[in-house]
Amino acid sequence: MQSEAELRSLLSRIDHRGYPDYKDTKGQYRFPGYVLSIDHVQGDPFASPSKVSVLVSGKTAGFPQELYCGKCQRIALQDELLRQFGRRAERFAFKAKGSGKSGLISVSRCGQEVLERTACQIQPENGNILLRMEIGFPANGRTINARELEKILFDFVPECVKASLFYKNLDAKRLRRIVDLAEDQEYIRKELPKRGLCVFVANGSVLPRESGISSRPMRDGIAFQSPTEQEVTLELPHKGKITGMGIRKGITLIVGGGYHGKSTLLKALELGVYNHIAGDGREYVITDATAVKLRAEDGRSIQKTDISMFINDLPNGKDTTSFCTEDASGSTSQAANVIEGIEAGTSLFLIDEDTSATNFMIRDELMQRVIHREMEPITPFIERIRELYENYGISTVIVAGSSGAYFHIADSIIQMDRYVPKDITVLAKKEAENFPQISVPEQLAKKPAYDRVPRPDQAFHGNDRIKMKTMGKESVMINRDTIDLRYLEQITDSEQVAALGYCVRYAQKHLIDGKKNLIQIVDELEEVMQNKSLAELCESTSSVSCMAVPRRQEIFACLDRYRALRLG
């Protein structure tokens, strides 16, 4: 390891040389209070910025252990330190001049959700803090401008580090509040199954968002108020008593007129699988962590999935116990999404009729009379929903605005009336008595088989070069194959997409052997991320600055949508 003086001398030596000579700076340098590591140097001022990291020892950082002793506390603290560093870095961005990306200083941009990221990691055993950033090494044309880089590395970065990664320079009360909030959120999440709940929405929550392109809370948004019949009070470790709506396990229907807030509530439930920052409005909207948003997904590929619970006797004779297609219809895609959700270990399905295949969700009495059951290959979801709960322990929350078919079988019915929820279970059930109930098959569906094994001929070996590119939250490309993730609505950050790409790549290089099935492969991927780190999925330190931990459910979904992965 070299000293900061040696780095300064090196920069002076390479000043005004050709840009490739910046490669000589790669290495570690000891600065007062931390170690600076130049992990990867860009080859051109217009290329992706250089990867730089700082390591602050736990003793120097000085954070009390109780702020990072548990996983939820550690993730919350990492998130806050990253935000603090990012705000400081923005003040210095492009103050060092030059061509291309010269002077850029950036870290991961955190949204409203609190995610575990590779950009800031605290080692729980000793409190060491590793923070990764990107820096555009300055140039004049394609000539090194070392004096400007010296400003960044010797003035700007040290100020950011000291202001955001040293406990003595931060607001201790604010940090305590952030960690306390994370502990309260984790407490609610653990309390849900004990109380027979799958969702909790606190009174006073603000669910509407600022706009379609902003996840910040709507200014003057109507505060949530639970129906009296569904109110639950919890005693949190730090906040104390909190009251809100508890959605019980089973079948819950959310109804109401258009624009009255049904989908807004469901959207909040979708993202309630994550913790949210203070001031978001959804801090105490907590959903079962395994919840999966279901929808139709026309055109997706399906490989060796047993959809016979819902679809049988296709006119083309296709086997639905091991169904394959490169262009799924709305109903077959939604059926596959249900089965894959069960395989991924979900305990809660979230469904909006607006994005569902109608023929998959319901089949009314008139249609059943005209098109007899033996002529219809689809068993609609309404006929299996109770079975899913009683035999698989999977609850369902459905948003409906056009069909009352689910009134008969719902355990709870909530009406959104001008953004205010009302419990109308008794009223709706009484009205439903005047309408025929959809018949349910007497025979239970055969339990789907989950023994899909990726073929090893699709694995990468040795030094095979693998190119990977992410396109926001939409997709990830591995070599020439694009994995379409547009309809995985619980992906909340592009860095989760990057992590999913690395999960696929790691599985292909290290886990796919023709023996392990998908469940075993995902188990091992989770083990790597939990027991080692997310960064372990990468092949070099130059690749680990932009990932956020994905859920198990999204890892499964990504593998299921990877057309190049052949399952046996």
Locate the predicted segments by residue:
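Carboxylate/His-rich catalytic cores and anion/metal-binding grooves
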Residues: 193-199, 203, 259, 266-297, ...
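N-terminal pre-Walker A segment at the start of P-loop NTPase domains
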Residues: 208-243, 278, 286-291, 295-302, ...
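Conserved NTP phosphate-binding and transfer environment spanning the P-loop NTPase/kinase superfamily
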Residues: 387-393, 399-568
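Conserved P-loop NTPase nucleotide-binding/switch module
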Residues: 342-385, 389, 402-408, 412-429
